[in-house]
Amino acid sequence: MKLKIGNVELENNVILAPMAGVTDMPYRILCREQGAGLVCMEMVSAKAILYKNKNTQELLKVDERERPVSLQLFGSDPDIVADIAASLEDGPYDIFDINMGCPVPKIVKNGEGSALMRNPKLVEEILTKLVKAVKKPVTVKFRKGFDDTCINAVEIAKIAESAGVAAVAVHGRTREQYYSGKADWNIIREVKKAVKIPVIGNGDVFTPQDAKRLVEE
């Protein structure tokens, strides 16, 4: 099944998720060769790009064979995120993604990744500025919520759609769950019902059968 994200048309709706330490260039090329419609890069700190961190420059490299490719940025400063994306607009990236789902303590302590789900107003500001700063499609990846007292994936998805985001990706666990327990695909369905933009399901997709079942459910 084909999928369109903004003006980027994908061959199919099978997407390689962004995974730090996993989705490097050789892995992405391999996944494209095996039929993935879109591959996502390892998350990159917008601040690290700003400060010209050497390791970060390596993470930004792309091979034409892997396109279309999505560059995932993370950060909590709306201006820095928007300015960095704008500075990379002429680069070999087809989509800009913003990470609002990373559960790692170091990231969360900095108010980045899934910590942003506790601050919908800041989410709105980041996404609004990012969408205005670039012509390429913007997507956002987030979780079911921060914890059981903050299940707000639907609210975040609606904010994203209103800000002009082209698609959202939803992981069916809260930040407090990390990767334990079972991913709640029902929340993905709720988000799908709440917005008109494409919704990408994430979590517990280990086999082709899982992927098929996720789409059906």
Where are the regions that the model predicts?
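Flavin-dependent oxidoreductase catalytic cores
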Residues: 1-217
